[in-house]
Structures are given as C-alpha cells and as structure tokens.
C-alpha cells in the first residue's frame, strides 16, 4: 500500500526542488558520513539572549556560528582575602594556557572597558586581568606558588574556537597552596566553594588548577554535594571549553566562617553545618540538653590529642578531671577517613583541643555543643579567636577559651624563665611567622593545671543544661 501511494503521487513529487534537495542531502550523509553522531548538535532552551548549546566535542566537529551577546563582567580586586571575577556572555576557557576569554560582539564593546564591565581596584579601561584563584591573597609564603589565570576581554577573532559547549556555569579555582592541611582544606577550599557554588544546586562545573586527585577522593562526599559533574583538571585540558557564565576565584569572608550578608541566598555557617550533616548522614543536629534528658545520661566530651607537638602531656589527669565534674570522656586521635571522623565527632556534646587543625572537627559537632580551645603560650590569643573562636558561635555552638600559663608549657623545660620567649613574644612575632611557628607551635606541648582548668569544665557542663 505504501509503495502504491508513493507511485500515485510520484508524478508531482519531484517537481518541488526543496524536497529534492533534502532527499539528496540525507542520502549523501547516509552514504558518505562515517558516523552521523560525530556531527551531533543539541539545542536546548536557555536564558533569553544566551542560546544554550551542547556540542559533541570530537575534533571532527565543524564549528557552528555562535551568537555573541554583550559581555558582562564584574571583578573585585579590593577584597583582602581573594580576587574574584564573575562573568556572563560568550566565555571560552583554555586550560593549558590558563586563559579565560570573554568574547565581545564588536570592538566598540571592548573600548573603554565595555559598558558591562565593572572592575574594582584596577584600571577601568583594562581588558586583561590576572587572578591567582586561591583564598590566601597577600600571603607571601604561599601565593607565589599559585597558578595565575588571565581573564581577557576580546573579539571573536581573537578568541580560540570552541571545542566543547557546556550548559552549566563554571568555577575556576586553585587546589594548591596549603592543600592537605585539615584546617586549610576547609578554610581555603571547602567553605569558599560552598559560598561560591551552593546556590547553583549542583548545576556547576569545577575547573581546577593544581588539582590534587587524592584531595577530591578524601572529600568526595562534599564535592559531590556541590557539583553533579566531574571536576576538571584544568592544567591538563587541551580543549577549549565554552560557557555562558563563569566565576574565576572563590569568595571568602572570614576564617572558617561565612558572612550571611555577603553570601548568595544569605547562606550562613548553620547552613554549611546542615550541608555537612546531609552529606555525611550525621544523625544529631543538637547536643544534649541535660534538663530535658534522663538524669542518668551524661554529656559526652571528646578530648582531641595531637600526634606531634602541642600534645596534652598529662592526658590521663585531664580525662579524670572531666569525668570528675560529670562528663563521659573519650580521648582520641581522630580517623583520617573523613566520614568516620565526622560520625565520631557528631556523637559528642563538647570538645577540648589545643589550638591546631584538630579543632577543625568542630564543624561536625551538633549545634549547641561546647568547644573548648586551649591556647598555647606565645601571644596566640588573637589568632586562636579568629580561627576557632568565632566559627563555633556562627554555627550556634558555645565557645570557651583557656589560655595556659608559662608553668603549663613545656617551653619552661627548654628556655629559662627570663627568656624573651616568656617575657616578650611580640618581637618574635615581628621578626617572622616562621620563628613563631617554630617556637610556639613547633616546640611546645601542654601540661594542663587541672585545678585551674576545672572551672572551665564546670562552665561547659553548665552550658549544656
């Protein structure tokens, strides 16, 4: 029947040139194309003015004409923690040269910086900006080793052609620096990533310079909660990746914390804590409330002891003192496997630790828990407060600080009491951080005076009522 119908209409069928051309074109593709999917182009609905295209990135693909909208770029170079550029338009990223091209439709869009370009802290007429996308801006000890990324405002003729299109935004940042230090992993990478990407609900791709593969394995649960896509090793990337939106650099507000007034959706550290609870399936959102619990149930106290310096020399005495005031106590060196460490910490109501990266585990404590930081000798009080004193309060937890005396420091076994190490640490601070780190963080252990420390334990117990 189908053949008969064709035959009936055959006299007029080939009188239409457009139809004839279509049939010939299809036959040509079937006969001569090795694989039709090599030329696949998928169009999806996008934001008005920014057509969304996902193109097969094979090298046999022939570049299609690209609509170039007016570029929008906002860079902030005045923040004291990090430089960040956010852009929208036709964006092309070439990893092997660490370049991000924001394409303008004409020279007129570029001259004078362009109407959609807003860069604070730099020349308003600039068309090229250099960023080290790591959140320790100004630190001479680490920033020279951070890969520099260049953002360029160019015309289409100056930009490399696209090899691969993406329908989600990109975030470009460095995984170098202090990567591997537990505190810096959260402070320099994870929390800034949360601030910069969480509002995108996983629809974002991370383009990472100095990518440490093991790091993404260690924090897999967190990374997969922030992006649905495999993070890209940008330094090894040979293709030109194209996006409609991109951010170069990460937003960072303060040490181990978030300023909700500056964060998308007013995200706070409470939101970050709940994010961690979700990613690690932590059961306890709130610490014990002793007045509401069975009176036979004791609050649990975790004493974190360090493997190297700044250890508790008299750990047994500290545990006995805490048990004496009413805590159920455990002393531990936490598992390096993050899910196991997170689960363990979440089961406690209070934590005691000497200033150091172990205190970073406070992010896994339930809300209303108590954090006790023991501050070693050497005028470390300000640093201790910034790094581990403010964050607990921002996470709806309680914070207590115990500053040790010279008698409680093992430095008294190394230096005479009349030494400047005890009498005047300030010149040592002014001389160099390396010297401070060597003496006060690298040579010192702690022998707590448990009688002097007992009121702090009682205060912690009171805060849990």
Swiss-Prot record:
Leading EC class: transferase
Q: Mind naming one GO cellular-component term on file for this protein?
A: Golgi membrane
Q: Which GO biological process entries does UniProt record here?
A: plant-type cell wall organization
Tell me the tissue specificity: Widely expressed.
Spell out where the chain crosses the membrane. 12-32
Q: Where in the cell is it found?
A: Golgi apparatus membrane
- What is the membrane topology noted in the UniProt record heading this document? Single-pass type II membrane protein
An example Gene Ontology molecular-function term: UDP-xylosyltransferase activity
Q: Does the keyword Cell wall biogenesis/degradation apply?
A: yes
List its EC numbers: 2.4.2.-
Q: In which pathway does it act?
A: Glycan metabolism
Q: Tell me which UniProt keywords the record has, alphabetically.
A: Cell wall biogenesis/degradation, Glycoprotein, Glycosyltransferase, Golgi apparatus, Membrane, Signal-anchor, Transferase, Transmembrane, Transmembrane helix
Q: Which residues are glycosylated?
A: 80, 118, 125, 266, 403
Enumerate the Lumenal topological stretches: 33-465
Q: Which domain of life is it from?
A: Eukaryota
Q: What spans does the record annotate as topological domain Cytoplasmic, numbered to this chain?
A: 1-11
Family, as annotated: Belongs to the glycosyltransferase 61 family.
Q: State what this protein does.
A: Glycosyltransferase involved in the xylosylation of xylan, the major hemicellulose (non-cellulosic component) of primary and secondary walls of angiosperms. Possesses beta-1,2-xylosyltransferase activity, transferring xylose from UDP-xylose to the xylan backbone. Catalyzes the addition of 2-O-xylosyl side chains to the xylan backbone.
- Name under which the protein is recorded: Beta-1,2-xylosyltransferase XYXT1
Q: Which organism is it from?
A: Oryza sativa subsp. japonica
